[in-house]
């Protein structure tokens, strides 16, 4: 079956995709509590339980001197050691066994999906719903990735969207490439991040037992799934050297996953084009999408954060959307939310680059 036909088949099978259209109704729910497919204003979406990932243009940075940077030396030392170990791991690549390459790819993809399909599109934005087996899979992948637990990751990400490019944005790209890439993890949070972050509604995350279970046991979970397991499996099962297992399969793989995610915060906010909203910093960056499983269509994502594809195009350089659609085909994902073509074209005309031809 041709790829585009397969995509249509999977996208329409077993579950519904809610289409967001435009304009002009503000009705979000019917009497039975189900989401309606009614036209909405472009700035609105149909997630009545989720409003805190929508950009708030009324928030402005406070005037006056900026607070002094407070370095977190523990993080600086640990990140430096991690990247030194990862660099050494690169030199070991030619000496690794084929099963180790496969293991690293498997572990990388599991961790990536735990971030992209899990912490990002499911828990931060509620762009689709997942049944328990899929949620467990994504929680495990998220723990393997070790980029903060789902609760903290989602809280920071919602703040990033709502207060984007301000002092309340945890990785504000206006503070430079290095800060938005990794520097924000090496210093104390700006007071505005804590102040505005505390105003976010996180009740949906607190109410989810699986998310809170992961948060409660996150440290031992990370120790086991991010460091011990990926090191011991190659060493024990196919007699890989301990050196290769530690520095390549574990430290290099972990550092690679971190930096690819960080590029969404840094490169995808600085380099690329802005077809959907030229008034905001996030850009469409194909190279970032290649590494980050489809997360580089960032101008679209910040314009329509409620679209489960995080892109106008579902499977185009977007492994995460392919994965979610496959999960929908077997009944594990449902209620995927997708912005309509009419809404996209209207938004391009209003705030985007009119020379851009929507596909």
Curated annotation (Swiss-Prot):
Motif Histidine box-3 mapped to chain:
298-302
Motif Histidine box-2 — list its residue ranges: 157-161
MF terms from GO for this chain are: iron ion binding; oxidoreductase activity; palmitoyl-CoA 9-desaturase activity; stearoyl-CoA 9-desaturase activity
| Keywords attached to this entry | Endoplasmic reticulum, Fatty acid biosynthesis, Fatty acid metabolism, Iron, Lipid biosynthesis, Lipid metabolism, Membrane, Metal-binding, Oxidoreductase, Phosphoprotein, Transmembrane, Transmembrane helix
Cofactor(s), names only, from the UniProt record: Fe(2+)
Residues that coordinate or bind Fe cation 2: 160, 269, 298, 302
As annotated in the record, motif Histidine box-1 runs over: 120-125
The UniProt record gives the binding positions of Fe cation 1 as: 120, 125, 157, 161, 301
Q: Which residues carry this modification: Phosphoserine?
A: 198, 203
Q: How is the cofactor bound?
A: Expected to bind 2 Fe(2+) ions per subunit.
User: How does the protein's chain sit in the membrane according to the entry?
Assistant: Multi-pass membrane protein
Superkingdom of this protein's organism: Eukaryota
Positions of transmembrane segments = 73-93, 98-118, 218-237, 242-263
Q: Which principal EC class is assigned to this enzyme?
A: oxidoreductase
* Function, in words: Stearoyl-CoA desaturase that utilizes O(2) and electrons from reduced cytochrome b5 to introduce the first double bond into saturated fatty acyl-CoA substrates. Catalyzes the insertion of a cis double bond at the delta-9 position into fatty acyl-CoA substrates including palmitoyl-CoA and stearoyl-CoA. Gives rise to a mixture of 16:1 and 18:1 unsaturated fatty acids. Plays an important role in lipid biosynthesis. Plays an important role in regulating the expression of genes that are involved in lipogenesis and in regulating mitochondrial fatty acid oxidation.
Entry's family note: Belongs to the fatty acid desaturase type 1 family.
Question: What name appears for this protein in its UniProt entry?
Answer: Stearoyl-CoA desaturase
The UniProt gene name for this protein comes to SCD
């Amino acid at each position: 079956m041709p790829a585009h036909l397969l995509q249509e088949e999977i996208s329409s099978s077993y579950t519904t995709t809610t289409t967001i259209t435009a304009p002009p109704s503000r009705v979000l729910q019917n009497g039975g509590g189900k989401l309606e497919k009614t036209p909405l204003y472009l700035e609105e979406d149909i997630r009545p339980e989720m409003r805190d990932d929508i950009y708030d243009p009324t928030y402005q940075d406070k005037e006056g001197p900026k607070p002094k940077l407070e370095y977190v030396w523990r993080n600086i030392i640990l990140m430096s050691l991690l990247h030194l170990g990862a660099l050494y791991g690169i030199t070991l690549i030619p000496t690794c066994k084929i099963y180790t390459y496969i293991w690293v790819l498997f572990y990388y993809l599991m961790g990536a999906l735990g971030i992209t399909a899990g912490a990002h599109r499911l828990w931060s934005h509620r762009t689709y719903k997942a049944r328990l087996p899929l949620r467990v899979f994504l929680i495990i992948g998220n723990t393997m990735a070790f980029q903060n637990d789902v609760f903290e990751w989602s809280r920071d990400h919602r703040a990033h969207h709502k207060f984007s490019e301000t002092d309340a944005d945890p990785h504000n790209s206006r503070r430079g490439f290095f800060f938005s890439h990794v520097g924000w993890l090496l210093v104390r949070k700006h007071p505005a991040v804590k102040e505005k972050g505390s105003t976010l509604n996180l009740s949906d995350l607190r109410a989810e037992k699986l998310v809170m279970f992961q948060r409660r046991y996150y440290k031992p979970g990370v120790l086991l799934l991010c460091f011990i397991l990926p090191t011991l499996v190659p060493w024990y099962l196919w007699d890989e050297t301990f050196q290769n297992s530690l520095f390549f399969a574990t430290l290099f793989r972990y550092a690679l996953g971190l930096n690819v995610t960080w590029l969404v915060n840094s490169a995808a906010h600085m380099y690329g084009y802005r077809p959907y909203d030229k008034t905001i910093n996030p850009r469409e960056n194909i190279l970032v999408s290649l590494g980050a499983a489809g997360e580089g269509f960032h101008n679209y994502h910040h314009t329509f954060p409620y679209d489960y594809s995080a892109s106008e195009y579902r499977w185009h350089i977007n492994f995460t959307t392919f994965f979610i659609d496959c999960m929908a085909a077997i009944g594990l994902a449902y209620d995927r939310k997708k912005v309509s073509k009419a809404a996209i074209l209207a938004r391009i005309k209003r705030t985007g680059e009119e020379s851009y031809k929507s596909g």
